[in-house]
């Protein structure tokens, strides 16, 4: 599960 998916910019 992607935990830092919000940092995938």
Curated annotation (Swiss-Prot):
Sequence positions bearing Phenylalanine amide: 9
Keyword annotations from UniProtKB, A to Z: Amidation, Neuropeptide, Secreted
GO terms of biological process kind: neuropeptide signaling pathway
Cellular component GO terms, alphabetical: extracellular region
Compartments where found: Secreted
TM region(s), chain numbering: none
Similarity remark: Belongs to the FARP (FMRFamide related peptide) family.
Name of this protein: FMRFamide-6
Organism: Sarcophaga bullata
């Amino acid at each position: 599960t992607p935990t830092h998916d919000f940092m995938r910019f």
